[in-house]
Amino acid sequence: MPSFKTLDDLSDIRGKRVLVRVDLNVPVKDGKVTDVTRIERVAPTILELSEKGAKVILLAHFGRPKDGPSSDLSLSLIAPSVEEVLDHAVLTASDCIGEAAASAVAAMNDGDILLLENTRFHKGEENNDSDFTKALAANGDIYVNDAFSAAHRAHASTEGLAHHLPAYAGRTMQAELEALEKGLGDPARPVVAIVGGAKVSTKIDLLMNLVKKVDALVIGGGMANTFIAARGTNVGKSLCEHDLAETAKQIMIEAATAGCAIILPEDGVIAREFKAGAANETVDINAIPADAMVLDVGPKSVEAINAWIERAATLVWNGPLGAFEIGPFDAATVAAAKYAAGRTIAGKLTSVAGGGDTVSALNHAGVADDFTYVSTAGGAFLEWMEGKELPGVAVLNAAAA
């Protein structure tokens, strides 16, 4: 297990200035936050520190500002939603460094919560500039990183600060790292991975890493067509990266060498147009008509996938099995998700899932809360699945050494 310090290692923090890196990169429409999930995830850390009397100073980025500050990317837009979720007053500052930040921090009382302005309004944030990092650190006594979703970036507020202040993992970061350790770090075996989505090209590193770590790899979604075509099967008009046939073959060779079973669809649900309620039928995967496209894996394939889930002690899931956004091509994803959720509830399976489409698919199936852990981290979750070291995590481990 990676070793890092958590809030449990913090004692007597009353009056201490705690810089907390959080992920507040939430969707906003017409000036209003439309989804507060990320705020809800960091609420326990913020409130725990506040209740212990710390001066809680929140650091976050929002969007991708191109040329310094812009009002439409100001965290002042997010502050009311943070207040609402926390049920606690949230102070704001017009900058994250300099006099504006320093005077706002100086005016804080014990237990106060202050949201500093968007760190990306300064180029030094993404450059991990040492002067900018020192300017951030000047307002804190302790650093807590609760933004696993930004841990794959070596930025000033995600990595740099841990070199200047005592560094700890927040509750969300801790939960994410402990769940990921159970998923791939030191999992109960057998381990089955489900990888879906449209393209092999975006997941080559992930697939190459997984075949060395899991006992079976289920491939679904559009990317399955690339593997099926690489075997010499006609996939009709299905989404397929024919130019990656050799890559697909190489992944299958690596899997065979590592003793990892590759599970590809045996049947598919085909249609001639990509729209909700399109006329469709189920065919054997070797009998796809030239004018049709596969939009979901078929019932025989779902049975095979569920049999692997039945055998598994650990399941890692990234990407839907079909075009789940439009019915009826959500059937396989929903069926497998519900089966995995049932095994998890019964205490037979540790299930870890992540990636934007995956979270949407599990919500669509109504089982996101029934998985052991569902990561909302996106890019950081994928890089972890690829076996890459995450700078924001590595620096916490180093700080605890």
UniProtKB/Swiss-Prot annotation:
Classification via Gene3D superfamilies: Phosphoglycerate kinase, N-terminal domain
Compartments reported by the entry: Cytoplasm
Pathway connected to this protein: Carbohydrate degradation; glycolysis; pyruvate from D-glyceraldehyde 3-phosphate: step 2/5
Catalytic activity from the UniProt record: (2R)-3-phosphoglycerate + ATP = (2R)-3-phospho-glyceroyl phosphate + ADP
E.C. number(s) listed in UniProt: 2.7.2.3
Domain of life assignment: Bacteria
Disulphide-bonded residues: none
ATP-binding in keyword set: yes
Residues engaged in binding ATP: 203, 325, 355-358
SUPFAM superfamilies: Phosphoglycerate kinase
Molecular-function GO terms, alphabetical: ADP binding; ATP binding; phosphoglycerate kinase activity
Residues the entry annotates as binding substrate: 23-25, 38, 61-64, 120, 153
An example Gene Ontology CC term for this record: cytosol
Keywords, sorted A to Z: ATP-binding, Cytoplasm, Glycolysis, Kinase, Nucleotide-binding, Transferase
One Pfam family linked to the record: PGK
GO biological process: gluconeogenesis; glycolytic process
Subunit relationships: Monomer.
Protein family per UniProt: Belongs to the phosphoglycerate kinase family.
Protein name: Phosphoglycerate kinase
Annotated organism of origin: Rhizobium johnstonii (strain DSM 114642 / LMG 32736 / 3841) (Rhizobium leguminosarum bv. viciae)
Gene: pgk
